[in-house]
């Protein structure tokens, strides 16, 4: 697991591509997910992109998503709730390949879901990267500022 930590601002280009910060690319290159050699994930590696219920996008390395995918695959297609969860999870997921400049294409559907049209904030969150439209992230942070101590006290 890469251990992504930090916050960076980047812009979506006119073709809907997002530049993955170099320090994050180095992390997953060090972990073997993006070694520049041809693989099942393309020449320069790949990431799984997931729409989230809070309006952000989460980016996962294939090695991290593999464990989550196994858990989802283990759900029964004959149990209506488990089948629904599978459908909902895979409906909001795409795998994208990095190009040689370290960019990933984001579909119009995913950009619209996250309210992204230009600049983004990319948060390193240990095993994933979280992509936010800056004003949306600011709203979440400002709206939750008084809850940090209580949440940290409850879970740590």
Curated annotation (Swiss-Prot):
Forms oligomers. Belongs to the MraZ family. This is Transcriptional regulator MraZ. Residues 7-64, 93-136 form the SpoVT-AbrB domain. The gene is mraZ. PROSITE patterns: SPOVT_ABRB. One of its GO terms (molecular function) is DNA-binding transcription factor activity. CDD domains: MraZ_C, MraZ_N. It is found in: Cytoplasm, Nucleoid. One of its GO terms (cellular component) is nucleoid.
């Amino acid at each position: 697991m890469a251990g992504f930590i930090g916050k960076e601002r980047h812009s979506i280009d006119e073709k809907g591509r997002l530049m993955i910060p170099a320090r994050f690319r180095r992390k997953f290159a060090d972990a073997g997910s993006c070694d520049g050699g041809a693989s099942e994930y393309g020449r320069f590696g790949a990431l799984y992109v997931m729409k989230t219920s809070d309006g952000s996008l989460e980016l996962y390395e294939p090695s991290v998503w593999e464990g989550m995918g196994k858990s989802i695959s283990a759900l029964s297609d004959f149990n209506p709730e488990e089948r629904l969860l599978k459908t909902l999870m895979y409906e909001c997921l795409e795998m994208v390949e990095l190009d040689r400049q370290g960019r990933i294409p984001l579909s119009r559907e995913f950009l619209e879901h996250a309210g992204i049209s230009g600049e983004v904030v990319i948060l390193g969150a240990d095993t994933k990267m979280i992509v936010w439209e800056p004003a949306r992230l600011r709203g979440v942070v400002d709206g939750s500022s008084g809850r940090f101590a209580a949440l940290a006290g409850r879970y740590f």
